[in-house]
């Protein structure tokens, strides 16, 4: 890249091409948990036709400090240019790459009850690159049914399905009594990550398998605490 062209790229709010995203360094989970929020706000800015934004303007929208934004993004090399700010489209795409959204991830759901079917009905997952390919259950009355054209299969079919389909993520929406054994089975079948909605903290033998536990009642308890706190002011 010539120096003149590099300056032109920078003038548009892009980084020089030598600035590559490096994920080898350890990034705190607190930073990782904030990245989807940046991605969401940047998507809204694109919908509004905003082409560039300063860290101060972004901080006002997100109700966080500008220094927090700069520190978070600097973990990945930084994306802004002094006097210009951030190119919204570029930053949106780069955060998408950081979060792995430039690759399709196939998901299966274990448990086709109310929660499992609600997840299968959430179409926005597909827009983010997450495609639910099947649900599994032990209830024979659900066999052969579909949720948004996604088939419900019997749990006994899980082994064969995973061996013939390239599944990345399994969502567990089943009773906690069976969750541990099913989780280990999924790991043995090559699942890379488990999205755990069962009311149990899972442990599996393979430490490279990512487990993200979602306890829905935890959020309600936090709301309850804040209601009590506010009532005491």
What positions do the PLM features span?
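Phosphate-bearing ligand-interacting subdomains
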Residues: 43-47, 150-233
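HTH-adjacent hinge/linker in prokaryotic transcriptional regulators
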Residues: 52, 56, 61-104
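Glycine-rich Rossmann-fold phosphate-binding loop(s) that bind the pyrophosphate
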Residues: 112
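Extreme N-terminal segment that seeds HTH/winged-HTH DNA-binding domains in transcriptional regulators
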Residues: 3-51
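Hydrophobic/small residue at the entry helix of a nucleotide-binding pocket
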Residues: 115
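NAD(P)-binding Rossmann-fold cofactor-contacting core
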Residues: 128-148
């Amino acid at each position: 890249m010539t120096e003149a062209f590099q300056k032109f790229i920078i003038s548009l709010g892009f980084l020089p091409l030598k600035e590559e995203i490096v994920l080898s360094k350890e990034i705190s989970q607190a930073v990782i948990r904030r990245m989807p929020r940046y991605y969401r706000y940047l998507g809204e800015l694109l919908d509004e036709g905003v082409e560039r934004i300063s860290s101060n303007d972004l901080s006002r929208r997100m109700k966080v400090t500008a220094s927090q934004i700069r520190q978070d993004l600097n973990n990945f090399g930084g994306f802004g240019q002094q006097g210009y700010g951030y190119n919204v489209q570029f930053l949106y795409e780069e955060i998408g790459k950081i979060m792995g959204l430039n690759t399709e991830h196939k998901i299966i759901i274990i448990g086709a009850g109310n929660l499992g079917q609600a997840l299968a009905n959430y179409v926005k997952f597909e827009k983010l690159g997450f495609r639910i390919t099947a649900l599994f259950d032990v209830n024979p009355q659900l066999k052969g049914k579909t949720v948004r054209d996604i088939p419900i299969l019997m749990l006994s079919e899980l082994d064969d399905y995973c061996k013939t389909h390239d599944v990345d993520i399994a969502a567990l929406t089943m009773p906690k009594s069976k969750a541990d054994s099913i989780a280990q089975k999924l790991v043995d079948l090559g699942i890379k990550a488990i999205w755990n909605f069962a009311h149990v903290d899972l442990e599996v033998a393979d430490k490279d398998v990512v487990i993200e536990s979602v306890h829905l009642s935890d959020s309600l308890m936090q709301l309850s605490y804040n209601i009590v706190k506010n009532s005491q002011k």
